[in-house]
């Protein structure tokens, strides 16, 4: 009896569905180079139709009200060259392999608006010049949606991935954040960032029989930043891959962790940081994008 030939793995979804790639907090310039390189390479291979950024890709350290802790932080406080330019270069790279990017603003990007609104007189005129929304949106070649941190209406800022699945930056930093998010979201599943921890909570509606879940894929920033030097974190590097039916009524997710500069995709392929490290190093040196 002849053995059945094994099919060659095919990256990407089958007809009738598409891939949505979820990218959590990055905190440029305090990003983890190896984790980011893995993400860039995986994005190249998978070519998701939609790419959703959960916010805090800019640390906005220059706009922080917290005191500095080191000379390294002082050098990092160059908002345009140290944060905006690398982020724009990264967004341009992602545009090469996706049809749409959704950027959900985080509390760190909101630092800019919060500080500018405290200024008086002519200083208010600089608000638009330093707005993360304007700085990151200008010059985009693909469809780009920026969702502000503070809503213009009573509806909380969110992005609808599927009929019963939303993405938000994060509503709480609680220890059991996933359970709290699901409690708040009620009859929606929710993927969130903000907490930097990999966490999941699932519940079933006993009346309708539907299952809902809330989860955080982790983060892409340094796992032990300077301000946590004497407080070991339980942060984890990771992303989420969500396969969504084109009618957006059904979906399933896979959230690979990134460990020691590598991760494994759903088809078993191992992605390593060295495959895209050259781009990350160029991104860090870029002055414009």
Which residues make up each language-model segment?
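Acidic, histidine-bearing metal-coordination/catalytic regions of metal-dependent phosphoesterases
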Residues: 1-31, 285-289
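Feature recognizes metal-dependent phosphohydrolase scaffolds
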Residues: 6-22, 42-51, 57-70, 92-96, ...
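Short acidic-hydrophobic surface loop/beta-edge motif
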Residues: 11-12, 154-162, 202-205, 263
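A structural signal for short, well-ordered beta-strand segments and their strand-loop junctions
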Residues: 22, 51-54, 100-106, 148, ...
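Core catalytic region of metal-dependent phosphoesterases/phosphodiesterases
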Residues: 23-140
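Conserved beta-sheet core of the metallophosphoesterase superfamily
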Residues: 164-256
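A short C-terminal boundary segment appended to hydrolase-like catalytic domains
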Residues: 244-289
């Amino acid at each position: 009896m002849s053995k059945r030939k094994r099919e060659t793995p095919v990256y990407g979804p089958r007809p009738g569905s598409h891939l949505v790639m979820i990218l959590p907090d990055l905190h440029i310039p305090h990003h983890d180079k190896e984790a980011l390189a893995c993400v860039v390479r995986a994005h190249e291979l998978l070519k998701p139709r939609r790419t959703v950024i959960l916010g805090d890709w800019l640390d906005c350290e220059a706009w922080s009200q917290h005191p500095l802790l080191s000379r390294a932080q002082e050098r990092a406080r160059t908002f345009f060259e140290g944060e905006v330019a690398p982020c724009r270069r990264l967004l341009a790279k992602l545009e090469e392999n996706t049809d749409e990017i959704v950027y959900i603003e985080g509390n760190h990007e909101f630092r800019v608006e919060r500080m500018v609104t405290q200024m008086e007189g002519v200083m208010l005129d600089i608000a638009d010049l330093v707005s993360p929304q304007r700085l990151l949106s200008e010059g985009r070649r693909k469809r780009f949606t920026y969702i502000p941190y503070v809503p213009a209406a009573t509806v909380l800022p969110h992005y609808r991935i599927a009929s019963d699945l939303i993405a938000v930056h994060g509503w709480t930093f609680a220890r059991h954040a996933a359970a709290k998010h699901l409690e708040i979201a009620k009859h929606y599943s929710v993927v969130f960032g903000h907490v930097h921890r990999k966490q999941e909570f699932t519940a079933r509606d006993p009346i309708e029989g539907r299952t809902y879940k809330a989860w955080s894929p982790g983060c892409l920033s340094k796992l032990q930043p300077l301000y946590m030097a004497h407080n070991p974190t339980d942060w984890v590097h990771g992303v989420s891959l969500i396969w969504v039916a084109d009618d957006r009524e059904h979906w399933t997710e896979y959230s690979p962790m990134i460990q020691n500069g590598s991760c494994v995709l759903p088809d078993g392929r191992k992605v390593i940081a060295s495959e895209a490290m050259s781009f990350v190093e160029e991104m860090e040196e870029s002055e414009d994008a």
